[in-house]
Amino acid sequence: MRLRFFALGTLAFAVLSGCTGMTPTPGQRQLLLVANDEKQSWTDAGAVVLAAHGRDNVQVIDIGTDPLAPRNVVTLPLDNTIAGPPTNLAITADEKLALVANSLNVVEENGVRRQVPDNRLFVIDLAATPPKLVDTLAVGRQPSGLSINRAGTLALVANRADNSVSVLRIAGQKVTLIDTVAMGESVSHVRFTPDGRRALASKFPNHKVAMLEVEGEKVSYNKVDL
């Protein structure tokens, strides 16, 4: 049996000029996040093979200063998984902060490895030289898709195993969990509308999209599904 071992990478990149509708100019910094899951692989038959955790990492790459020669700014040893991406990474519009959710961990019991839900959200200071981890928050179980509003003041995280959405306040480099919205069903991703007044959450198992109302920092779910 042959195993295909390779780093599973997921991407998230946000360009400040892209968020404002402008075209980036040469030499302007643009950041790309690459999350590498180093613990999951497959056999040729498609069976999942799990390795011990502890080798995952997140890379911060500058793709704007010299587009022909992207530069790895820093590699941070942070747990993450291919099961949650590609939506479990986000960068604020001003490129000063990044959020990375870790959906699943690998545990070993009686010689058998299996995946279990995690609840960690990593906060990365992109303005630091080099960028660094500044906080780790506990959100819901199996945090998956997440998004940040255009103002960079509020973030939402869909928690698959908790049937909930976490609401996070962003103030400078400080990120705070301020509320948890019960969704009644498993949600895999959540995203703000462009005006920031609503958000849409995907209820993947039941093929539904839930609508959330956003008023300032208050996020509510009035049982409206599409």
Segments and roles (model prediction):
Residues 1-4:
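Positively charged n-region of N-terminal signal peptides that target proteins for export
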Residues 7-18:
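Bacterial N-terminal signal peptides
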Residues 19-226:
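Predominantly soluble domains enriched in secretory-pathway, periplasmic, or organellar proteins
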